Every structure is written in C-alpha cells, then in structure tokens.
Amino acid sequence: MTKYHNPAKVVTGVCRFSYANLWEAKAMDENSKPKYSVSLIIPKSDTKTIEKIRAAIQAAYEEGQGKLKGNSKSVPPLTSIKTPLRDGDLERPDDEAYANSYFVNANSITAPGIVDAACQQILDHSEIYSGVYGRASITFYAFNTKTSRGIACGLQNIQKLRDGEPLGGHSRAEDDFATVEDEDFLN
C-alpha cells in the first residue's frame, strides 16, 4: 500500500518557536475565531527546509488556482499574492531572534499535537514557550477573502527538541532562583 504524500505539507528542520500560543486558542480581535498559533523562525542556513517550504507554497498555489481566481478572469501570479515565507532581516530588522532567518506564521483552529524529542506527548505547559527549539509539521493552502488572497500556513503538530532562551523578556522561575539551603533564610 502506497502512503499518500501531500505536496503542500512540510515537516521543518530545527527552528525556533516565537509567539507560541499552542495551549490555548487566542483571537486576534473580537471579530475573529480563536486560533492556536506560532511563528517558526528558520535559519537561512537551513536551505533544505526553505526549499521544501517554497515547493509546498508552489503546490498550494497550483492546487488552489480556482480559489485564487475567484470572480476574476485570471489567476494572479504567485509573486503578486501574499505568501507565508517571510524574511526576518527585512521584516524584523530590530529583532535579534529573527536575524539571518526566515519565518512562517502558522495557525489552526484545532489544537496541535505536541511531543518531545522521543515523540512522547508533552502535557506540562511550561515545557513549550517562545524561545524553545523544535520542529513543526505545517500545511500550505490557498485563501481568498474580501480583503486579500494568497497562500496561508496551517499548523499541524509540534515537536520540542531542546530548551532555548525565552523570547519576549520573560524569564523562567527555575532560571531566576537558586535552591535555598538554609531553613532560616529570611533572617
């Protein structure tokens, strides 16, 4: 039996998670649906992942031409529509975490599966935060709304590979404090 291969699906190489809203869906505003989301920061040196993403965007474009065309007479060229692969050096020049990297914002209305390096489910919310390193399975698809059209990125699953420096200026409690040895430490 042959396993189906979705050309619009990518499992990334090691990337860094930013704006990680993976435990609770959040709405961007009062008129939008709550979604789980993450920004995947991909080093520009990971050319294998970047090429897989570009190929998946192309596949989503070809698959979604009817949707992208909408009521128009023709399908807009891929270069003229919104795509999710963005250059951190150009779009986030003041953010060190995005230096020499591309990024993709992925979201979903359903919760992603979250596992560790051994593929064991992670239940402790403190294990996944903005700054952690891991991999993600993502899918690309065409969209056409009243205000824009393009290719979007859907979040499927997350795999944590290792801890990283927390992003957003929030430190972890276990990093801020040492173990207290003296029972009478208040005096």
Where are these regions (language model features)?
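Residues in well-ordered beta-strands of folded domains
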Residues: 39-41, 105-107, 159-161
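Compact mixed alphabeta submodule
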Residues: 119-187
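OB-fold ssDNA-binding interfaces and closely related basic DNA-contact patches used
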Residues: 1-103
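Residues in flexible loops and secondary-structure boundaries
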Residues: 25, 48-50, 112-114, 161-169
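A sequence-composition feature that detects small, non-aromatic residues
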Residues: 8, 20, 25-27, 55-60, ...
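Acidic-enriched, low-complexity/disordered segments with a strong bias for Aspartate over Glutamate
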Residues: 29, 46, 87-89, 94-95, ...
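Structured, beta-strand-rich domain cores
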Residues: 66-147
